[in-house]
């Protein structure tokens, strides 16, 4: 059973409707179209980790804060532009902002907006069918969800267990269940 199938099954179990599932994981980002409880199509990011949860973890570390602190900072900031497409170059850009005395809140907000923008561009390439649902670790950040909703121009739903959608889908597949 593929990772895509697991996320599709888990997303369907959590959201219960045809939708576009966006999974922002630690190493990649997936946009998955689910219809009739089946994966119909998907697209994964083709760049480095700059549009993933790992990117945010690296940047939080660079700012010297935990992920919870990072999101709290981001919610209070005015986003600075983070334009580099590569994690290494983006980290250099963040270091430059720190060196220039920019507020950590503004840097954190810029990082979240950068990731949300990359995810939105992946969605544009794939296309969105139906409602949009977010899974993966970033679904725990209300600020990321709101930012992604703004980038997409439509609401993005999440679920308290959305970070576990892949594991849930794997369990459903292992049980031989099909909706």
Named regions from a protein language model:
Residues 15, 38, 103, 125-131, ...:
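Short, surface-exposed connector motifs at secondary-structure boundaries
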Residues 36-79, 86, 172:
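Glycine-rich phosphate-binding loop plus the immediately following alpha-helix
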Residues 24-35, 85-92, 138-153:
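Acidic-glycine-rich active-site phosphate/pyrophosphate-binding loop
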Residues 1-41, 169-176:
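Conserved phosphate-binding catalytic cores of ATP/NTP-utilizing and phosphoryl-transfer enzymes
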Residues 9, 53-57, 159-179:
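Glycine-rich phosphate-binding/hydrolytic loop that grips phosphoryl groups
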Residues 124, 128-151, 162-166:
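Glycine-rich phosphate-binding loops at beta-strand->alpha-helix junctions
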Residues 90-123, 163:
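Adenine-nucleotide phosphate-binding core of ATP-dependent small-molecule kinases
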């Amino acid at each position: 059973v593929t990772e895509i199938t697991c996320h599709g099954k888990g997303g369907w179990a959590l959201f219960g409707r045809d939708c576009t599932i966006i999974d922002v994981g630690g190493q990649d980002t997936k946009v998955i179209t689910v219809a009739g409880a089946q994966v119909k199509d998907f697209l994964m990011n083709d760049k480095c980790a700059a549009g993933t949860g790992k990117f945010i973890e690296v940047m939080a570390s660079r700012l010297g804060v935990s992920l919870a602190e990072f999101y709290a900072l981001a919610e209070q900031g005015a986003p600075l532009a983070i334009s580099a497409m590569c994690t290494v170059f983006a980290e250099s850009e963040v270091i430059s902002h720190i060196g220039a005395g920019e507020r950590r809140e503004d840097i954190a907000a810029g990082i979240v907006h950068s990731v949300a923008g990359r995810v939105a561009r992946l969605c544009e390439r794939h296309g969105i069918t139906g409602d949009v649902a977010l899974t993966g670790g970033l679904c725990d950040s209300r600020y990321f969800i709101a930012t992604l909703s703004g980038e997409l121009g439509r609401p993005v739903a999440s679920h308290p267990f959305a970070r576990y959608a892949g594991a849930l889908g794997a369990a459903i597949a292992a049980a031989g269940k099909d909706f």
